[in-house]
């Protein structure tokens, strides 16, 4: 499971290092490949290939003309690109994905259980502030209570 928040630099070529703890989880449970795609928030999602393929298989069983399915395919699947780690544990983020998420000099990696989010530093700060405002909502508290009982 991916967890934790890590700040890293991104170089002029668009490479950034996958944080060691996230890399250990990736290599230990999967392999050294990630699928990067645009998220609905202004960030990127990084899936281990096996998790991504499971998502695609589930999606393939759905009616592609269903509005939510078609939109998900256009926004999420069509943008997806496989990005293997190099020998130094770096990931080359394609220019279109960097542009979408506003990744320039600093990136924030956020472990989200089965997926990793990549944010610009500013985007992450804004998302955290929004999450803190929502954290007091009844819906969030209900989910947390359900998880504690499971």
UniProtKB/Swiss-Prot annotation:
SUPFAM superfamilies: AbrB/MazE/MraZ-like
Record keywords, A-Z: Cytoplasm, DNA-binding, Repeat, Transcription, Transcription regulation
Entry-linked InterPro entries: MraZ, MraZ_C, MraZ_dom, MraZ_N, MraZ_sf, SpoVT-AbrB_dom, SpoVT-AbrB_sf
GO molecular function: DNA-binding transcription factor activity; transcription cis-regulatory region binding
Pfam families reported in the protein's UniProt record: MraZ
Cellular location(s): Cytoplasm, Nucleoid
Range of residues in the leader sequence: none
GO cellular component annotations of the record: cytoplasm; nucleoid
Tree of life domain: Bacteria
Main location: cytoplasm
Domain SpoVT-AbrB, first and last residues per copy: 5-51, 80-123
GO biological process: negative regulation of DNA-templated transcription initiation
Subunit annotation: Forms oligomers.
Protein family per UniProt: Belongs to the MraZ family.
Name of protein: Transcriptional regulator MraZ
Organism: Myxococcus xanthus (strain DK1622)
Organism phylogeny: Bacteria, Pseudomonadati, Myxococcota, Myxococcia, Myxococcales
């Amino acid at each position: 499971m991916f967890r934790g928040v890590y700040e890293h630099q991104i170089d002029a070529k668009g490479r950034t290092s996958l944080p060691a703890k996230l890399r250990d989880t990736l290599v230990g449970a999967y392999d050294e490949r990630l699928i990067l795609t645009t998220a609905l928030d202004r960030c990127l999602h990084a899936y281990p290939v096996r998790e991504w393929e499971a998502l695609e298989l589930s999606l393939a069983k759905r009616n592609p003309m269903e509005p939510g399915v078609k939109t998900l395919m256009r926004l999420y699947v069509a943008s997806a690109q496989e990005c293997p780690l190099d020998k130094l544990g770096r990931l080359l983020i394609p220019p279109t994905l960097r542009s979408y998420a506003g990744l320039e000099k600093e990136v924030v990696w956020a472990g989200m259980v089965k997926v990793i989010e990549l944010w610009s530093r500013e985007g992450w700060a804004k998302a955290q502030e929004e999450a803190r405002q929502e954290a007091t909502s009844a819906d969030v508290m209900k989910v947390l209570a359900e998880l504690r009982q499971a």
